[in-house]
Amino acid sequence: MDFKTSDGIRINYYVYGTGKPVVLIHGFGGYQQIWCLQIKNLIQQGYQVITYDQRNHGASTRDEQLDSIEPLIKDLYELLNYLNVAKPFLIGHSMGASVIYGFLSLYTDFPLSGVIAIDQSPKMLNTIQWPYGYMDVTRASYKLKLKEHGNVRETLNGVPSQVISKLEPEKEMFPFIRAENLPLLYDHAKRDWRLTLEKINIPTLLVTANQSPYFNGKFADVMRQTNPQFISHQAVDQSGHVIMVEQANKFNKIMDNYLKEHQ
């Protein structure tokens, strides 16, 4: 299914099941099919599941002028209103988590039941005071290092075949061109959402990976200390960056417990 944003971008989305809504948001270069191991589980638990391809991703329209994460944040807001979603849970992976951080910052009055952010530091640029950013990038080096990317292995032990079978047809039909989307990645990297998390009054679970190639999971403990009433942290062992795929059973158990606690 598709809907058009206020600036004419067509967003491809799917709605599964009925019940309390859970919105799943993929990361940079991702596809909504990455959530295939969560969708069935959530439907069985009695939730309505909403997935979508962010602009410039998957089956959604390419925006050649995209150089900011803010349109992606607005897309989420418009999709929720278009579908008349009432008090959803938002679950985001990587840049999808940053879209949620931005949503919390821009739409403070939008009623949410809770948030799960998967392996995404709220500040990606490292400083002496904040050594919890993306790898070793700093304000001086981030453009060069993000452009090169290098031979970084995102996962610890690869992606399960049942996920690959869902992703590969989408990648063939709708290839993601990293070079064309570097302006978006650069803007994503420059953002600092720490103050947003410090001030939120919505239950927020930060899920980190002990073997993430990108982030030191200690960032989540630091953020939890700034807002212990509303921020919690779960670390998953034997996983790289794509936790919900690499350790689906562990992640789904964490997710299920969190959703039940905050319904």
Each language-model region and where it sits:
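Conserved HGGG/HGGXW glycine-rich cap/lid loop of the alpha/beta-hydrolase fold
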Residues: 9-61
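Conserved loop-alpha-helix segment in the C-terminal half of the alpha/beta-hydrolase fold
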Residues: 204-239
